[in-house]
Amino acid sequence: MPAAAAVGSSLLPPQLHGLLGFALADSMHADHVVVVTDNLVPFPCLPWQIQGNYVDQVVEVEQVGLPEKIVSGTTQITKSPDRLLIAEHCAKFVRDAGIMKDGFSFQAGAGGTALAFAIYLKEMMIEAGVTAGFVRGGSTKYLVEMLEEGLTPVILDGQTFDLEGVRSMRENAGHQNTSPFTSYNFHGKGNFASMLDVVILGATEVDTDFNANVVTHTDG
């Protein structure tokens, strides 16, 4: 099966979709790699995540997709009072347990509750005068706001969940792309998942051994 992805110019208009970190492994190990794009640019195509030495063909199409559709239901803040309360309690725990201090790090996923957590935590950081050492993406406009308001010097990004994340990746030197090799690879010497102080992610199922299902709903 070919591995298909757009080129690194996906950070530039007209078609924006952001980072390709999770497609990087596919491009390196697939038998055949096809890059699909509607935005051919002169060499070199910067920034590049998928390098040309892994690519067999580049296919130009009229339109890859609709950038405004990047934002889906899972990348919008929850309106559920129960989930907002969960998010607030999580942020208060991080603060009251002493985890929220200068130089701490956190990851907030794209789920509605995790996004709300980031907003509550941001308010508490401002109130306490605390800045993070780094923040782990997937990036959203809420993490971008923290970067641009000086609450963190760096976003280490693995996915781009909205157009503000794409813009920030293009414009902010402190917004850096990453791949699963450096993020979550248990055998990687530079694996920074274990460096995170706080991780707030959504899951449809969690068992008593803390194994989490984030792929399918409970009905399969």
Residue positions per predicted region:
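Conserved phosphate- and dinucleotide-binding cores of soluble alpha/beta proteins
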Residues: 1-105, 116-125, 129-133, 142-220
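Glycine-rich beta-strand-to-loop/alpha-helix junction loops that act as flexible
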Residues: 108-117, 137
